Amino acid sequence: MNIFSSWASSRSTMLRFIALSLSYTLSLFIFQKGLLVKRHVLPLKSSCSDIVSEENCWIKPKYNKSIFLIIDALRFDFIFPYENCMGKQQLKGDEKYYHGQMPKIARLLREQPGNALLFPFISDAPTTTFQRIKALVTGSVPAFIEAGDNFDGTKISEDNILDQLLASGKNATLLGDETWLQLLPDRFHRHFEKPSFDIMDLDTVDDAVIASIFDEIDRSDWSLIIAHCLGVDHAGHRYGQAHAEMSRKLLQMDKLVEELTQKMDEETILFVFGDHGMTSTGDHGGDSLNELSTALFAYTRPNGNESAKPFSAEFDCSGKFWCGVDSVSQVDLVPTLSLLLDLPIPYPNIGQIIKPIFGNDSSNLFQQLKLNAFQMFRYAREYAKHQIDLRDDLSKISRLYESTTNTDDLTQTIKNLSNLIRSSLDQFYFELCLVGIFSLVDSLAFNCFLIFNAKNTTPFFLWIFRSAMLLLQLSLIFAEKPGNDQLIYTTTSLFVSLCYFLLVFLFGSSIKIKFKYFISFLFSNFQFFGQLILGFLAFSNSFIIYESDVLRFSIQSLILIALIKQLNIHREFSIYRLSFNFKMFIFHIIVVFPSLLILKQFESCREEQVLCYTFIFTSEQLLPWSILASFVSTFFLLEDRWKALKITRFFVWPLLILLYLHWIFESMVMTMKGKPSTSQSVHNTINLFENLSQLLAKSIFSVTLVHFFAIKLFGDENLNKINWLKSIYQMISLPLIMLIGAEYGWRTAFCLFLFPVADFFFQNDIKNWCWLMSLLAAYCFYATGNQRTLNSIPWRAAFVVLPGNFAFKWVPASFILTAMFFGQLLASLMAHMKEEETAPFYLILFLAMKVLGSVLASLLHHKHLMFYKVFAPKFVFDAVELLTCCAFNFIIYLLTTSF
């Protein structure tokens, strides 16, 4: 025990930090498991025996085959036939790249009105590919938290249309996106898949689809072809909607649709649709109208019988231009295809058949709606066994259903039932949420204990107790449904822990408080109360939407407090009598305030923000400014603020040249692709420049890694921890700028020099210094174009260095997290440069206080209309930011253990 105490007293800082990080991690996972619950999956499946039918499975099929052509991110206005509805007119500005680029589909709608239909196809948030595929095959609505499965999707186990197809003795063929195989393995008779994660590659997947689909149509042993093209989506991610590459991909898809309509036979129905839309910058994941709205184009070949058109509606530009019906939900495709091919509707489906596709036979349509309602009521009754609140409303709708005698009433009944099931899917585990909050408060208390007790040895019994408590918390996370005993044991342990910390806080020798000095204590620790107030402002959705403004105001206010303290010291206001230190103080304020103002002008806007305009510039337009800013920032870090080591200077300046070459080649690729060309030499040149650009990016990262080792091998004999960390800060600045991109490079450069400048304030006040660093780190997230929304995730960062088909997904994921939360990395490096070993713990404490506010706000507003749009993303991003900051600090501890 003495040996352990001796070891703990000398080398315990990193161990303490690991214990603290684990405590925060488990607390957040417990709360997330209670708040963002995955939908309960029923293992039941539909079958032909569910319905009594003499010759068929459920109903007589209308078609024998179907083709799904999925054009990823096909927004509705991309396919809308403007020429049909508005005549030939000049498109305004950048609209020429994405409007009116599918004229062949417009011609089919105009010339074959009874055989071609177009609907707005509305998806459910989150608009990520995994969730959309799941909805398209099961007819269900995935939960918000399942957006994380987009990186490592789990297999779909519940009933789906592909399983029904196989059970009926039919088969399916897959072409294109390999995600389908990951989610639905062993479902396809033949598959010709390509990797889907490389957003820099616009053509590989699409070309593979085009090369195989016509040969597949010629075969006679298929019933469903799923062809998933990714070029439009990747063009959006890489270039945005207003680019010649977007026009090229839309025209290519338009031509493919025309060729399919000519190749298919009369027994086949073609569905062309998108899985989601995109924003003007090509992003998706959220629930804005542009992200949710995609298109569904349905087509059958004319059969020569003009009196019996296959569809009961025609495309109409006036009024309800979507064929006389309301917009179609994405889940509606599942029951529609099932009954068209005479397949049992998958058990978890909550979609409604698309009536115009079934023709004009009202009696047959009523029967199809009855089958749709039967399946949905069956699912709702089974689901109600697990969701008691559903039962009363279900009984009311069931009574209305029994008295329904016409298609309109039956349609409304199905719609009401679908809405009821959707609302019941939004559930949470309140007891687990409370344990998660209790755990987070305990982690905060543990954090405070480690700060105020930093100079003393942590008692051995406390390590034993916290280890046991961590095991209890782990049991809650891994249990499918935690039992009452687990909850009681964990809560009791947390209560005992909090009581211990409270007693230590009140009576411990190092942090003893006299109540008569309580007011003085509050003022001396105002930064903690200030951060708590900032955290609790998350109860207001307006604060979340305008959080960047609040952070910027807080930074400026804190610096003004530092100025007031300086003025209190320098009461003599003569400019000639002021100390050099005070003049430098004023100079640093003059640098920081305008920098924050400039960064504010270029922040990205959220959909909910009013009077906000996002300045959209191409990377080519911003390249000169990024080059200039990166040079100034590098010079400032190397030659002015911190005198760089010779070996660091030897590495950084050549690295800056490599960065410029990388940007130049990247810019040339963007420019050349913006000008349509069919010349093979041009395409070869583009490929060469792309390869050179990525090779330079790899070289920059490789040289940075070499520097980490070289500085220890060949560095100064007097190299210490602080100098080494300064060299790391100087060295990683250029890879960070490159990772975030030329478009945001100049903003990243601003942030890089703001931290050393802000270091001048509160040099002898560790608490205020850490609070300022924490606020600045949080603001850098917004300064580089990010928002607390899924569609603002910088996917591009994953592909700057690595190819899209890189085997280990955690590596590109780490690049994305670094690009988003690089401010926390910089703040962590700055904290480890301080003499105070508590600085990293203060940094984590301030960040965790903000997370506490997000946690409480998300629980309180769980039923709020804006929960999934504002409060849930806020909690997720704040939690990930805290865990990422813990990871950054852990890595720094590992790298500095030898000092």
Predicted regions and their residues:
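Solvent-exposed coil/turn segments that connect beta secondary-structure elements
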Residues: 74, 141, 230, 277, ...
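Active-site neighborhoods of enzymes that stabilize oxyanions during catalysis
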Residues: 286-295, 300-304, 313-323, 330, ...
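Metal-dependent active-site segment of extracytoplasmic phospho-/sulfohydrolases and closely related
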Residues: 68, 75-76, 241, 248-290, ...
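Active-site rim elements
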Residues: 92, 148-152, 247, 281-284, ...
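Short, low-complexity, Lys/Arg-enriched N-terminal segments of secretory-pathway carbohydrate enzymes
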Residues: 1-9
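Alpha-helical transmembrane segments of integral membrane proteins
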Residues: 8, 15-35, 425-899
